[in-house]
Amino acid sequence: MKTLHNNYCNSKQGYLPLFLSDCLDLLDPVLTFERLMGGIDLNKYLTDIPEYTTGRLRYNPVNMLKTVLFGFMTSGYCSLRELEDNCKVNIRFMYLMDHQTPSYRTFGYFINEILQDKIENIFNDINHAIFNDEHVDLQHLYIDGSKFEANANKYTWVWKKATEKFRYKLYEKITAEIEEINAEIAWSGVQITTNPEYVPDYLNEIVEQLVLLWELDTSTFVYGSGKRKSKEQRHYEHLTTFCQKLQEYIQKIEICGPNRNSYSKTDNSATFMRIKTDYMGNDQLLPAYNVQIGVADEYIAVVDVNHYRSDMDCFVPLMEHFKQTYGFYPKYPVADAGYGSYNNYIFCEQNGIEKYMKFPMFKKETKDRKYHEDPFRAVNFRIDEQGVMRCPNDKAFHFLYRKNVRGNQYGRKEELYECEDCSGCPYAEKCKKTDKNRTVRINQELTSMHQEVIENLESIHGALLRMNRSIQAEGTFGIMKNDRWYKRIVRRGIHSVKLEVLLVAIGHNLYKYQKKKMRNRTAA
């Protein structure tokens, strides 16, 4: 029988080549990665690792960092077990780790303890190296956000408004309890003051005073069936329970903070949001994080993780983060209709940023001619020679008053106008929905901003930017979620989640860089 295999070497006999690099192709991703990392000083982030006097010598921290980053580059998201396994069987990881095989616990300690406070600076240094090599244009920034489901149980919500309602009901119970106690201790001349609201320290002080007044011994309290509690014991237990419950409500409201209305019990940093991918099929809120990215020439230039459910509140923090990283604001931030608000437009004007963010009614204003030319819209009303606004029936609208818009940080005001007389108007059914004279709200400043945005985005430059935003910003999330299978947050806590998202962003940029280098060398 003819031999179809080589039999001149075996597992007990060494053979050439002796170096792993000789087994790799010149265009191999790990060699491209190694050349890029060679131009970055990684040692400065790894000098403060604590020294241990017992146990084995530590692994080379630079090799550990390269291995972690390369794992996220190749897999999108690389678990600790995958890193451990790759170091044992994958020749590329063997090359980076010099044949050493750290355990998953070692990788976990290195990521969670060593890289926690340094990962953002590492992300920025890698970006600077890539951007200088690729001549990335940072003046055009394509912004998008996506909600990633948190690693939290689904039915563990805490609602801020419900907690506040329960707290006020508890105040009423405390007041009723104190009034009952006052009636029983009237003989002593002691009166406990009732308040509209209470704090736990005040209740603890009341309990201490009652213990002294009644000379209570908690060791003599009775429990269980067949035993009757005294009035003093009942009042003591009620006040103690109220104090614990009040402390719980205060803690829940503090965790929510002023900028969100819910959180999860298993991940206090996660906020309940409505996610597009409703796999439960009941339109239910799920614990999630709002991940914001700014993309420049297909690379993630800036990334942020927020509690906010709306993208409008995420624009300014993302721009400030961009300036903190690169020293300037982008000239042309391009975003969808979720970012176009009065606050964001004013921020752009104050910092010399062009307005290329759509507003919520942008599509209807530009695509729906019937809506845009509707004669019953206040913005389409005629202005006569005296500057008075007149409706299609030629009735004058008189100024009523100005009012502040709630939740606006720049003091935005709306002007309210009322029609002089709508009785007998032939257009009443089309113009208004009530029997009263029609009133309209107008903000000329915001209307002029919307017109400026339309002119910017409808220009040739604006059309190209809109097209590029759909390709680059939304395409980046598409690659992360569907091509590289990162669809859900793994870690818990806002700091750990930011660490994880930054690692995924670094992996994406390295992946893009390697793909572009491969295409260029193949074409050459």
Language model feature labels by segment:
Residues M1-L31:
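Hydrophobic alpha-helical membrane-insertion signals
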Residues K2-H5, E51-G55, H461-L464:
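A ubiquitous short alpha-helical element
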Residues C9, M94-P102:
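Peripheral, non-cofactor segments flanking catalytic/redox cores
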Residues D22, G55-N60, F72-G76, L96, ...:
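Short secondary-structure transition/capping motifs
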Residues L26-F72, Q444:
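Basic, short loop/linker segments at the boundary and entry of helix-turn-helix/winged-helix-like folds
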Residues G39-K44, N90, M94, D483:
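A short secondary-structure junction motif
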Residues V68, G76-V89, Q100-A524:
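Anion-binding and metal-coordination hotspots
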